[in-house]
Amino acid sequence: MARIAGINIPDKKHAVIALTSIYGIGRTTALDICAKTGVSAAVKISELSEKQIEELREQVAKYTVEGDLRREVTLNIKRLMDIGTYRGLRHRRGLPVRGQRTKTNARTRKGPRKPIKK
């Protein structure tokens, strides 16, 4: 297994799909990385040479991925909560942040139903 950005990339998958196993890299970014390195998107990771894998590593290193990206997102949410914005309050209360209705639905965000105590 090739190791890129601290993640074991699956050998049996095509390069584009394998790169998406890194947090912060989706299909579009993976296609861009493959295009910049000259690696065909259809080739499997196991068929790549060590030089090509090193080029992929260098390209991925230019993006904010994995731990750094997770930390950045967490700090952004924490900042919203600290300055008291509406979005921050919704995060703090565990409710939908982007304007979805909460009278019905929103169960994923609110969690399981709590019985009404009489």
Curated annotation (Swiss-Prot):
The keyword Signal does not apply. Part of the 30S ribosomal subunit. Forms a loose heterodimer with protein S19. Forms two bridges to the 50S subunit in the 70S ribosome. Keywords: Ribonucleoprotein, Ribosomal protein, RNA-binding, rRNA-binding, tRNA-binding. It comes from the Bacteria. Residues 91-118 are annotated as: Disordered. GO terms for molecular function: rRNA binding; structural constituent of ribosome; tRNA binding. GO terms for cellular component: cytosol; small ribosomal subunit. InterPro entries: Rbsml_uS13_C, Ribosomal_uS13, Ribosomal_uS13-like_H2TH, Ribosomal_uS13_bac-type, Ribosomal_uS13_CS. PROSITE patterns: RIBOSOMAL_S13_1 (PS00646), RIBOSOMAL_S13_2 (PS50159). The lineage of its organism: Bacteria, Pseudomonadati, Pseudomonadota, Gammaproteobacteria, Enterobacterales. Belongs to the universal ribosomal protein uS13 family. This is Small ribosomal subunit protein uS13. Located at the top of the head of the 30S subunit, it contacts several helices of the 16S rRNA. In the 70S ribosome it contacts the 23S rRNA (bridge B1a) and protein L5 of the 50S subunit (bridge B1b), connecting the 2 subunits; these bridges are implicated in subunit movement. Contacts the tRNAs in the A and P-sites. SUPFAM superfamilies: S13-like H2TH domain. It comes from Hamiltonella defensa subsp. Acyrthosiphon pisum (strain 5AT). One of its GO terms (biological process) is translation. The keyword Repeat does not apply. NCBIfam families: uS13_bact.
